[in-house]
Curated annotation (Swiss-Prot):
SUPFAM superfamilies: Class II aaRS ABD-related (SSF52954), Class II aaRS and biotin synthetases (SSF55681)
Family: Belongs to the class-II aminoacyl-tRNA synthetase family.
Residue stretches in coiled coil: none
Localisation: Cytoplasm
Organism whose genome encodes this protein: Chlorobium luteolum (strain DSM 273 / BCRC 81028 / 2530)
Reaction(s) the record says it catalyses: tRNA(His) + L-histidine + ATP = L-histidyl-tRNA(His) + AMP + diphosphate + H(+)
Recorded name of the encoding gene: hisS
Species lineage: Bacteria, Pseudomonadati, Chlorobiota, Chlorobiia, Chlorobiales
Protein name: Histidine--tRNA ligase
Molecular function terms, GO-annotated: ATP binding; histidine-tRNA ligase activity
NCBIfam families per the UniProt record, alphabetical: hisS (TIGR00442)
Highest taxon listed in the record's lineage: Bacteria
Amino acid sequence: MSQYQAVKGTRDIFPEEAAQWKHVEEVVHTLASLYGFSEVRTPVFEYTELFQRGIGATTDIVGKEMFTFLPDPGGRSLTLRPEMTAGVMRAALQRNLLSQAPVHKLYYISELFRKERPQAGRQRQFSQFGAELLGVSSPAAVAEVLTFMMQVFETLGLSGLRLRINTLGDLEDRARYREALRSYFQPYEGELDESSKERLEKNPLRILDSKNPALRDMITGAPRLFDFVKAEGVREFEAVLRFLADRGIDYDVDHLLVRGLDYYCHTAFEVQSTALGAQDAIGGGGRYDGLAKELGGGKEMPAVGFAVGMERLLIAMEKQGLFATLNPHGPLVYVVVQQSELADHGMQVAFKLRRSGISTEIDLAARSMKAQMREANRIRSGYALFVGQSELESGQYALKNLVTSEQTTLELQAIIEILREPSIREGLKA
């Protein structure tokens, strides 16, 4: 064993698990295209103040969880991105996207970094997929983003999901609510944990995020943000709920849901999975109209988005047995060379197959025919194509189905035509 190990909070993903990741990513790419979202990629690190201003200085992410570097040569601190929305908004403002078109629909599958205590589904390097709809934040836009997210879960076969949703109102609503919360919690200050005492002073909304079970009754009795939202905000929220009902999407209105990022306004939501236990949130999002202005954009930009944690999603899928039928095949063909002196000819055959768009593997270690067949079965090859002296002389090659054991002998070009048939994988089902 090497003296070097993966850094705490990171992990390696090998081929079998990588196939599961690829399955999820392909579903995301396909549905993003159906909904009209285009992929965006941003740098893995940004100037630290982007996250301080965008996410909020009082959040746990900024206060405790960011990987921050010594200043760059220009003297500015840099941070590995802990979330995507601030970076996407920075990119949109820098490119001046809304001057090119009134609406932009962007999505991503990206690596992120947070200095958290590693546990199942929570790593220091982790992945998310998500979407950002910029330029419009109407109830229909919120429903569009939510429907996209929920259809990803549905397509993957996930069950036992709970969509929690709330309205956070606008800046004025939340300012009045913060004062009401501060007045409510101050008499209980002696019962609060140290983290909540700090939040009481800086941003009492964050107390509602507390996972301390000793505070649950106190939090449950707190004033509802909904009661501080203006009538217009309530009407918009009710319109979102109607859109969800029309699409057959079940939801629970949760007046304690505030999310952990300061840029959210109006509608916010979170999806939980019963398969995950205590750490049950797999995704969430909401509107963030004020983020553009906070990042120096000059004015508010209507925006709404979501993000889903890939690691937690994959754990939930595994627990529900959703990878049992995935069982991906290896290469379609394994070229079995019967005599070592024919290795060059075997390579030529493999080259022709690959140039014809057929996934092909061939032994590179001059192993015995028996060892090659074991390897072909181990990597789940669909067919074995045999290269021997008789094949070289006759131009006829034996092709064996490694699932059914059926075998046929044909010229190489005829074999290529058969293997290029779109339905060829159907013949590999036992």
